[in-house]
Each structure stands twice: as C-alpha cells, then as structure tokens.
Amino acid sequence: MQRKTKTAKKRSAGKVGKAAARKAPARKSAAGRPAARSAAAQRALGQRAREIARLLAAEYPDAHCMLDHRSPFELLVATILAAQCTDERVNMVTPELFHRFPTPAAMAAADIRELEALIRSTGFFHNKAKSIKGAATELDGRFREGFPRTIEALLTLPGVGRKTANVILGVCFDTPAIVVDTHFRRVTQRIGIARSDDPDEIEREVAALLPPDGWTGFSHAVTFHGRRCCAARKPDHARCPVAHLCDSRDI
C-alpha cells in the first residue's frame, strides 16, 4: 500500500475539517439533551422565535388542522390513522368509517376485521384498527360521561401519544399545545429553534421560546410552511418569509 504524501494528507485533513464544520452536532449534556444556552442566548433566540411566529402567521393566516372531523372522537381516530400516512388519504377513508361507526360505542362493538378492511389504505392497519377499537372502548367506558380534556387522561387511551393528544387539545379544546409532526420537526431544526431529534424534547424547546397562547397557531403555521415551502429535499428559499432568520438558508 502506498503512503500518502504530506500534500495529500493535508488535503484530506482539510476536507474532513470542512465536513465536520458543516455537520457539527449540537453539544449534548450528560443526560443526552442539547447543552443549555446562556441566559442571553436564550433571550435572543426567544425574540427570533417570536418574530418567526409572527411572520409565519402572516404568511399562512388559513393554517389549520387538515384532518376532517366533526367531534373530538373523530379527530382522535383520524389522528391515529394519520401516523405514517398523509392527511389526504385519511380524509378519503374516514367518511365511510364514521358513517358505519359514528360513535365510540359503535366503534367499540365493531368487528376488528371490518375496521381493518376500511382503513387498510392508511397503512399499518392491524395496529391502527386495534388502537382505534381500544380507544373507542375506553371512551365508551371510563370516559362515557365526557371526553378527556387533559393530556394525562388522553395518554391513557390506546394508540394515543403526545402528538395525538396535543392535536386534540389544541384543535378541540383551545388548550395551548405544540404538535411535533414530521414537518414541525424538520422546520424548527432548520431555522434553529430546536436542536434535539426527540419529539418530546423539541416540544419543550419550542414551548420555552413562545407564549402558550401562540403554541397551537404556531404548530399549524410551521406545518403549512413545511408542506408549501420548506420541503424536505428542496426548500424554496427564494419565497421563504423567514429566510433571513433561518440557520439553514444556504442549504
């Protein structure tokens, strides 16, 4: 094997150094979370986050939950079905599903194979059918007197994680909630207001930067921005309303 010349070694080291500089990860604390910012840096980031929220709200005044529903129960089911599936596909499936099983009691009594057949096109239909039937059973039992309105209660339902619970709280009950979906995660990381890869940690990071009464609207606006402008592969910097505030404007 030939030895590298000094020049070749320097070139190689230079390339590695540049690549490391471009992809340097956020420093992590011993607990695995990004290292804490200084108080001054956190205040500055909060100001930037609030300006980003203002600009996105102006850009997407129609931002809202895209899942069709008429009740918290229907939104719960639709959100479970939306895992690893587009909202458009879910909206094609739910009209017939809710026509056949319009209430938690009806869905709890449904034949699991019939549920699977109705939701097959949303993917992972075995697990989703089990979750929505299980959640419906709980709603018709423990929560018959009233739909759960706290994140703690919602998280006890089969198939319900923080994302689903926050969707329901923010949309149906006007409870401040941050919904970390694929678009929200990508956009907040790109613009630099979230550093973690963990959805729960991203929720905490963003919540610390914005007033609670803006959480739900910001979630919708960021998701719209991710769909319409800040695409995964080719973000449209030319028409991005927050490009001047974005850490990734040169990608």
Predicted regions and their residues:
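Polybasic, lysine-enriched low-complexity intrinsically disordered terminal tails
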Residues: 1-43
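Catalytic cores of DNA base-excision repair glycosylases
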Residues: 37, 41-251
